[in-house]
A protein has these predicted regions:
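Charged alpha-helical initiation segments
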Residues: 1-37
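Short, hydrophobic, well-ordered secondary-structure elements
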Residues: 34-57
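Non-transmembrane, amphipathic alpha-helical segments
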Residues: 1-5, 32-40, 117-121, 145, ...
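Amphipathic, well-ordered alpha-helical segments in soluble domains
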Residues: 12, 16-19, 43, 47, ...
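Flexible secondary-structure boundary motifs
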Residues: 63-143
């Protein structure tokens, strides 16, 4: 589920910084590195927003059948320009988002995450990138310093992609059927 563009941005940043260092342009290399960190954070968070928004819309479409009014309502009032309100970015989990689909869904997701340390780490990476995105956008983009390396951002992105794929499964009607069987 990883995004090829983000992969290219990461490779471009590494290549450009290496080239500048080879030419002894340390100041330019440092500047480019700081810019690409912001680009990668925004690119990853934007990609996740796009995928999860589409997943929510697809879920609404599947469960609403031929009546598309609920889909339109969800797209207009829950998704468009509202994505970042679906999560509590100051927490290290996605409980707020999952609880929007009911307490049973939240509890089942939490149970599955607690049983799988890798998936739990993927959730934390997703939340961290969303938090960094908000800080960049709301805390003076030009001045804000992303206090992590390009490599760390890229690795968090890859890990967070796994969590976004998991959310797609949660937003499948079969997940609700599983809840009913487990309950």
């Amino acid at each position: 589920m990883e995004n090829d563009r983000i992969e290219r941005q990461y490779q471009d940043s590494k290549d450009l910084v290496a080239y500048l260092m080879e030419k002894s342009e340390v100041s330019f290399a440092t500047y480019i590195d700081s810019v690409y960190k912001k680009v990668l954070v925004l690119s990853a968070a934007s990609y996740f927003e796009s995928v999860i928004s589409k997943d929510i819309s697809a879920y609404a479409t599947k469960v609403s059948g031929s009546d598309k009014r609920i889909v339109t309502l969800i797209e207009n009032k829950a998704i468009k320009r509202q994505y970042h309100t679906l999560f509590d970015w100051d927490k290290n989990n996605t409980n707020k988002f999952c609880s929007l689909f009911g307490e049973n869904t939240k509890n089942k997701v939490r149970e599955q995450l607690d049983e799988n340390e890798h998936l739990k780490a993927a959730e934390r990476a997703f939340v961290e990138l969303g938090r960094q995105r908000n800080l960049l956008v709301h805390e003076n983009f030009a001045e804000y310093d992303v206090n992590t390396t390009v490599e760390e951002i890229y690795e968090k992105n890859k890990l967070a992609c796994e969590f976004v794929s998991y959310i797609e499964k949660v937003l499948d009607p079969s997940f609700v059927k599983q809840l009913a069987q487990d309950g």
